[in-house]
From Swiss-Prot:
InterPro entries per record: Ald_DH/histidinol_DH (IPR016161), Ald_DH_C (IPR016163), Ald_DH_CS_GLU (IPR029510), Ald_DH_N (IPR016162), Aldehyde_DH_dom (IPR015590), ALDH7A1-like (IPR044638)
Record's note on what induces expression: By water stress, low temperature, heat shock, high salt and abscisic acid.
Broad enzyme group: oxidoreductase
GO molecular function ontology, one term from the record: aldehyde dehydrogenase (NAD+) activity
EC number, UniProt record: 1.2.1.3
Assembly with partners or alone: Homotetramer.
Pfam families with a match to the protein in the record: Aldedh
The protein's name in its UniProt record: Aldehyde dehydrogenase family 7 member A1
Lineage, highest ranks first: Eukaryota, Viridiplantae, Streptophyta, Embryophyta, Tracheophyta
Keywords for the protein's UniProt record, in alphabetical order: NAD, Oxidoreductase, Stress response
Classification via CDD domains: ALDH_F7_AASADH
Source organism of this protein record: Brassica napus (Rape)
Sequence similarity: Belongs to the aldehyde dehydrogenase family.
Catalysis: reaction(s): an aldehyde + NAD(+) + H2O = a carboxylate + NADH + 2 H(+)
């Protein structure tokens, strides 16, 4: 590696080259005929020493899809439990490189090391979950009106599933989709985020090794690094019946319209504008710790980040007092350093958006209680921020992808629910209360309108056993557990 820092030497352990890396695994081969790009370390905005990647061209894409079409004919005929065993082996391969992959994720994306390792572990957990699922893709026997007859319902693979992931969870979202899609008998075409190509390559190399070891077509799992051109090709491609997209509501709507125009299906995981409600009977210390974790973690770049804190008027001052004390103790710094709680935003543009967002907030009557500034020096660091503002302010309805928390006051449970439901997005929500009456109202038809409705836990940290996703402008998709697998298959009744 020459003069490269020793802290980067681990990258060779996960198959990354010291010169340039081909960023596309198509037809069982690594190639690249697109642009040569470099990835930045968000902690200092310097080009990583081995971070040059050759992205996909449209010609590479076409080679990959033709090979994927052929591989689908083989993969869908492999018995589901055997497909599950292949996914088990993928999980084992990831497990063997867990620390290296987690470190790379932190280095390239910017989240702290514990979160980087935890995200890769989530993919491993999804592999384990999918193994069990591979023996439970059950159909139904349905009574028939005809004498001596019955109806059978069974599930068949779609063929190819496109997965377009975002920078903030470059591994986990792949796991939620690909592990399920594979055991359901589908080939996967993955386009990782253009700003996290190294983790895309490293993950794919491990999957490719498993397929090769089992003498299976490499095109069962096709991966490409690239930008909007490749994403648009996936959305338009009639050979891909289902496209899973994670990103902003604006881009997601475009993907949905493009796929729908060809009568394809979409699975959308889009913007979140998540609220935590703290009632007058809540455990204040528990609530304050949870809010800190939900609002500051991943530098506010989770889709499930808590962005709105709804405080009952009787506990408003007490909760804010605890939070303001905790916020001042948050260590901002290199995500790979021990003790860091808040790493950088992912890109310099994100840092600029934070600064612009604070100005908009102030113009709409927002009062900065703590933070509100970018940190001077290298890297994309900003201060964790709490804003006192009216729930009627237009900016509260929007998602600022940064560690910015709006503090809002309410008087009654009904008012809190109304504020929670007043935004276009509907991903995650949580209430802190000891009242069974409030809890059952909260999770019922007159409560939260979000896909995730938590009680006495943060808005983030959804478990893989349940279906992950949201309503309204969040897209309506469901990934990971429960019966999400049905989206990756077609139902046949006979």
């Amino acid at each position: 590696m020459g003069s490269a820092s020793k802290e980067y030497e681990f990258l060779s352990e996960i198959g990354l080259s010291s010169s340039h890396n081909l960023g596309n695994y198509v037809g069982g081969k690594w190639l690249g005929n697109g642009p040569l790009v470099s990835t930045l370390n968000p902690a200092n905005n310097q080009v990583l020493p081995i971070a040059q990647v050759v992205e996909a061209s449209l010609e590479d894409y076409e080679i990959g899809l033709k090979a994927c079409e052929e591989a689908a004919k083989t993969w869908m005929q492999v018995p589901a439990p055997k497909r599950g065993d292949i996914v088990r082996q993928i999980g084992d391969a990831l497990r063997s490189k867990l620390d290296y992959l987690g470190r790379l994720l932190s280095l390239e994306m910017g989240k702290i090391l514990a979160e980087g390792i935890g995200e890769v572990q989530e993919v491993i957990d999804m592999c384990d979950f999918a193994v069990g699922l591979s023996r439970q893709l059950n159909g139904s026997v349905i009574p028939s009106e005809r004498p001596n007859h019955m109806m059978l319902e069974m599930w068949n693979p779609l063929g190819i599933v496109g997965v377009i992931t975002a920078f903030n969870f470059p591994c986990a979202v792949l796991g939620w989709n690909a592990c399920i899609a594979l055991v359901c008998g589908n080939c996967v075409v993955w386009k990782g985020a253009p700003t996290t190509p190294l983790i895309t390559i490293a993950m794919t190399k491990l999957v490719a090794e498993v397929l090769e070891k089992n003498h299976l077509p490499g095109a069962i799992f096709t991966a490409m690094c690239g930008g909007a051109e490749i994403g648009e090709a996936i959305a338009k491609d009639t050979r891909i019946p289902l496209v899973s997209f994670t990103g902003s509501s604006k881009v997601g709507l475009t993907v949905q319209q493009t796929v729908s125009a060809r009568s394809g299906k979409t699975l959308l995981e889009l913007s979140g504008n998540n609220a935590i409600i703290v009632m007058d009977d809540a455990d204040i210390q528990l609530a304050a710790r949870s809010v800190l974790f939900a609002a500051v973690g991943t530098a506010g770049q989770r889709c499930t980040t808590c962005r709105r804190l709804l405080l009952h008027e009787s506990v408003y001052d007490k909760v804010l007092e605890q939070l303001l004390t905790s916020y001042k103790q948050v260590k901002i710094g290199d995500p790979l350093e021990k003790g860091t709680l808040l790493g950088p935003l992912h890109t310099p543009e994100s840092k600029k958006n934070f600064e612009k967002g604070i100005e908009v907030i102030k113009s709409q009557g927002g009062k900065v209680l703590t933070g509100g500034k970018a940190v001077e020096g290298e890297g994309n660091f900003v201060e964790p921020t709490i804003i006192e503002i009216s729930s009627d302010a237009a900016v509260v309805k929007e998602e600022l992808f940064a560690p910015v928390l709006y503090a809002l006051k309410f008087k009654t449970f009904e008012e809190a629910v109304a504020i929670n439901n007043s935004v276009p997005q509907g991903l995650s929500s949580s209430i802190f209360t000891r009242s069974p009456d409030n809890i059952f109202k909260w999770i019922g038809p007159m409560g939260s309108d979000c896909g995730i409705v938590n009680v006495n836990i943060p808005t983030n940290g959804a478990e893989i056993g349940g279906a992950f996703g949201g309503e309204k402008a969040t897209g309506g998709g469901r990934e990971a557990g429960s019966d999400s697998w049905k989206q990756y298959m077609r139902r046949s009744t006979w």
